[in-house]
Amino acid sequence: MAPSFLKDLKRRSKASFRTEKSTDGSSSNETNTSTPSTSTLNSGGGHEGISTTPTPPLTSSNSASNLQGLDNTVPPPLPSRPTVSIASKRYSTAGSVSGMSGLGSPSQNCTLPSSPYAPRILNVADNAWVYQKVLSVYGTIADPALQALEGCITVKRVDDGFPATDWPVCESHFKVLVYLLPGPNKLIFNFTSPKLANNNLGNPIHSSHLTIHMIPPLASPPLQLVVLMGQDSPGTFDSVPARIEREDNSLETAIKKFRMSAYLWQAFTAEQMYRNKLGRRVFRFEEEWTNGTASYRDKGAGTMRSEAKVHVVRCSKTVAELRDLDLAQQNPNAKHSGDLFSIALQAVKGYFNPLPGQKQYVSVLLLDAHWDKSHNMITGHAALGGGSGEIQLAVFGSQALSSYPSHIEEIVPAFSDCTPTDTDWVANDCNESGSSWEAANIGIGAHMHETGHLFGCPHQTSGIMLRDYVTLNRSFVTRECYSTRTKSKGGLVLADQECSWHRLDLLRFRAHPAFAIPGDTPRHVDDSVQAWPVDNGIVMVTASSGIAYIEMFLDGEELCNHWQEFGEGPNSVIQRQKELTEPELRARLPEDRRKAKLRLSIKSVAGGSHEINDFGLLASKASRVKLPNGQFAFKSSKSGLSQMNGSKPDQVVLNSAVNQPTLLTQVKFYHGFALDGVEFCYEDSTTQLFGKRGGSCSDFNLDTRKGEYITGFYLRSGFWIDGLAIMTSLGRKSAVYGNATGGSGHTLMPPRGYTLVGVYGSVADWVDGFGIIISR
C-alpha cells in the first residue's frame, strides 16, 4: 500500500510543482500566489534571509521531471527549496535587473534579463569608495537622443538604513543625492514612468543596483559649522509669514537648513574634484550623535543619526549692535563695515580656544542678519572669508535661509520653488533673488564662495570664486525653472551647463590638509618653495614636498589666466627641483603680452606658496653678486615684504666663505616677538652684523673640531621675519629665535651644486626681508 502522503500527491496537479532551477516566465499573465520575489525575501526582521511563510502552490505550468516517480511504490525525494544567501549576490554587483512582475524572482544562478529603461549611472562605478556623507549621482534612462522620457527615480537602501527618496527624470536625465552611512551602502535605483508598461506594479522592472563604500576621513581637520547669535538674540531668522506657519523660523530649523546646505557644499565639491581627475576628496565636518535631520521622516520616527555638528555660539554684542548700519557691509557709508568679521572671529576664537599652531576652519552663519526695508539693505550681514593664525573663518548672513532645504527630500522642491520674493519680509539680495529658488542659489552658493576664501582660494576668472554660484541649482536638478534674474524660461540643464569650482581652486584643495583622505601618503612637514637665480638666466625652483603648479600673472592682472601644472598623469614623477627660463614661460602667454612684466606664484605639493614679483628681474644680472674673490654669487628670492616704514636693504657676505683661513665659530641671534638681527662671529674675534642688535640675544655655537658650517636657514615669515633658525652640515638645527609660530615656515637650502656664502634682505625697526646668497 502506498504511503499516505502519496495519496495526497496524486490528488495534486502536476502544475503545483516546479523544478529547482525553473525560471519559466510564460505565465506572467496568470494568477500568481507563489514564492515572493527576492525583494520580499530581504524585508523581514532586518535580515536578508528567506521568509518563513509556507510557499503556496503556483497555478502555472511547470516541468514535470519531479513527477516521474508518483506511481512508484518508493517515493522520490522532494525537491529542495532554493536558498537565498544572507548577503545576496545581486546586491553586490552593478547593473540592472528585471523584477519580472507576476513571478517569483529567479534563482541566483541564472542570468537576469536587463531592462533597457533601467537607470544608467554615469559618474559612480560599482564598489566605488567615497569619503563624504552626501554623494551626487547622475545618469540617464535608455538613450536620451532617441527617447526623452519623463518619470521618477526612487533610491532606496537594501538595509532600509535611510528612507527611500524620489527624484525627477527630465528628458531621460536624472540627478540624485544619496545619503551614505559608513561602510558598504547597497542601493537600488528604480525608474517608473507613466509612459512605460508595468509602471504601477509593486515589483519594479526597471532597476539598477549599486554598492558604494563610504569611509569617514577622520585624519583631516574638520570644517566647523557655527550659528552665531547676539547675546540677546531670540534665535529666529527672516522668513515670510506663510513659510513661518508651515515650517517656523526657529533656531532648530536654522540648524537643519544650515546643515543641509553644508551637505550640498560637500557633495558639489567632491563631484567637482572627481570630474577634474583629483579623486573623490573633500572636506569633512565634525559630527555628533543627535536627532536625525537628513530626512523629514527622522523626527516622526525618532531616528538618531551621526550628523554634522552645528555649534551655536553667542557673541558679546546685542542684536541691535550687530544690526547697526555702520557695520552693514552693504552700506556704502558704513564706518566699520568690516567689524562683523572681527566680532565673529573673536567669538569663534573664544569658543574653540585653539592651541598655538592648531588650525581651526570655521564657517559661520550670522543668524541675526535682517532685511531692513526702510533703509533698503541687509543689516547684521557680511560676506567675508579669510583669517590668519589659528582661525580660518568665513561669515555669511541668514537673509536667504528660509529658502534653503531642511531635508534631503526638500532639495528638488527648494531649487524648483518659483514663489516670488516678498521684499516686505525678506531680501532680494543683489537683486538676483527674485524667486525662492534663486534666493537659495545666492545664499548657499555665496556662503560656499566665502568658505572657498577660508580654504585659501582667491577670486578667479570663472567658477564659484567669480560668481557662478547663481546657477548652483543646476548641480542638483535636471530642469531649471523660470529665472527672474535672466528672464529665461528654463528647461533641461546638463552637466556641461552647471557651475563649477575653477581648476586652480581644486588644485589648492588637493594640497589642503582639510581635504586629506585615507590612503594619502603622510603630509610633508616642510611645504616651502624656494627660487634660486643661477647661471645663464636660469631660475632653479626647489620644494622638498614637490612642485605642484605655477600661476603666471601679467602686469596689471589680479586674476590668474595662465598656469602650468607639474606631476600630472599616471606615470608622472613629483619634481622637487625644476629649472625655469623666461623664454619658456613667456611662450605660454598670449603673443601680444609676452613683453609684459611677469609675476609668478609657485605652489608646492604640500600647499606652500612662494611669490616672485618680477621674474625677469630675478633671472637677470641684478640678482648676481660679485664676491671679494672675484667669483659671482646669486641672491635667492626673498621672504618678507620689505614694506615697513624706514625699511632699508642690508647684506652680508660671510668672511668664512671667501677667505678660507677665517673660521666661523658662533652665530648670535637678536630677537623679541620678531627677528632684530643676526651676528656672525669668527675665530679671530671679528664679527659681521645683519640687521640690528636689539631684544634678547641667543647664541648658537658651531663645532669647529668637526668642521661644522652653516648649510641653510629655516625661517618664519609673513609681512616681516618672525623667527629664524640655523641648519648645519652635521644635520643639526637650532631653535627658532623670535616668534616660532608666527607667519608661515620656509626652508632656505641651496640647490644641489651650490653653497651658502651670505645673507641679504631689509631692515626697519626689525628685519622685514631675508634671503640667502649662494655660489658654486
Task: Indicate where each model-derived feature is located.
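Non-catalytic terminal regions of proteins
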Residues: R18, S22, L41-P54, N62-V74, ...
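Beta-strand-enriched, solvent-exposed domains that form extended recognition/catalytic surfaces
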Residues: G95-P221, Q530-F632
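Propeptide-to-catalytic entry region of secreted or membrane-anchored zinc metalloproteases
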Residues: F162-P163, S172-P182, S193-Q392, Q399, ...
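Short pre-active-site segment immediately N-terminal to the catalytic Zn-binding motif
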Residues: V426-A446
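Active-site recognition of the HExxH zinc-binding catalytic motif
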Residues: N441-P458
